[in-house]
């Protein structure tokens, strides 16, 4: 029996390292749900509300730094994802949202629970498209996952329920995603200028934002050498506050006077 688009989609998620899909079972997601059952290498986490699923995917991506996935069925199912997707996108974590829709034959007819996912998710995603044919789906899914990983944000792929039930078309160039771990380093001249600045001052305070999230040890070491207090932004709290003897608190939203 030929592989269905839904099975192809699940295979590609597994290949990309996705461990779970947070979603509510039913309706236009039935084919994908059944494909998860058949695959056995990925877990369908049934939540009580799609908003919870989107937040859960964002939390998983933030904790593990890997692509996480949530899904919503047609109409209110995927509309409920939007709060969690905004949170994930603003937090800079890779999340793929599968926005299932009604059948393609009903597009543009004001059919029951019809929405325009392209408009709906435009402001909270790096990639946002709808696959209307089996040929499009693997290429769009690969592009969506790569955009989420490379951009550290949300990617949305709209998948009509009737498309997931059709026979899949294998696109061998679209079966692989590539994790990226870019390292941004200042030039030697900039580092020398910073060293001169720090050496020339007696009282120094370090203020760390989300850009310092992977430099906890370096921040602690530098603050120790300079005997400088360390303040941090809301987004960098989780990365900078812990085990930091010189931290003085957070600034901005929910901040404190010491910060």
Question: Language-model segments: which ranges?
Answer:
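N-terminal alpha/beta PP-like core and its mobile active-site loop of ThDP/TPP-dependent enzymes
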Residues: 1-259
């Amino acid at each position: 029996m030929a592989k269905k688009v839904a099975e192809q989609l699940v295979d590609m998620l597994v290949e990309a390292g996705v461990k779970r899909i947070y979603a509510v079972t039913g309706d236009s997601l039935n084919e994908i749900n059944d494909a998860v059952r058949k695959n056995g290498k990925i877990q369908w986490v049934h939540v009580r509300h799609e908003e919870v699923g989107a937040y859960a995917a964002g939390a998983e991506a933030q904790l593990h730094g890997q692509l996480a996935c949530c899904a919503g069925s047609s109409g209110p199912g995927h509309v409920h994802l939007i709060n969690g997707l905004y949170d994930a996108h603003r937090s800079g974590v890779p999340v793929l949202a599968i926005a299932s829709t009604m059948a393609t034959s009903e597009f543009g007819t004001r059919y029951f629970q019809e929405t325009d996912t392209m408009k709906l998710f435009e402001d909270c995603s790096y990639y946002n498209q709808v696959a209307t044919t089996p040929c499009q789906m693997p290429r769009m899914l690969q592009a969506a996952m790569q955009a989420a990983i490379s951009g550290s944000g949300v990617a949305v792929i709209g998948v009509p329920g009737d498309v997931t039930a059709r026979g899949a078309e294998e696109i061998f160039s679209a079966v692989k995603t590539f994790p990226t771990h870019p390292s941004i380093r200042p030039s030697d001249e900039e580092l020398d200028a910073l060293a001169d600045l720090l050496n020339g001052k007696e009282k120094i305070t370090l203020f760390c934002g989300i850009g310092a999230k992977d430099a906890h040890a370096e921040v602690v070491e530098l603050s120790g050498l300079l005997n400088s207090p360390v303040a941090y932004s809301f987004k960098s709290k989780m990365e900078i506050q812990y085990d930091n003897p010189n931290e003085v608190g957070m600034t901005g939203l929910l901040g404190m006077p010491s910060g």
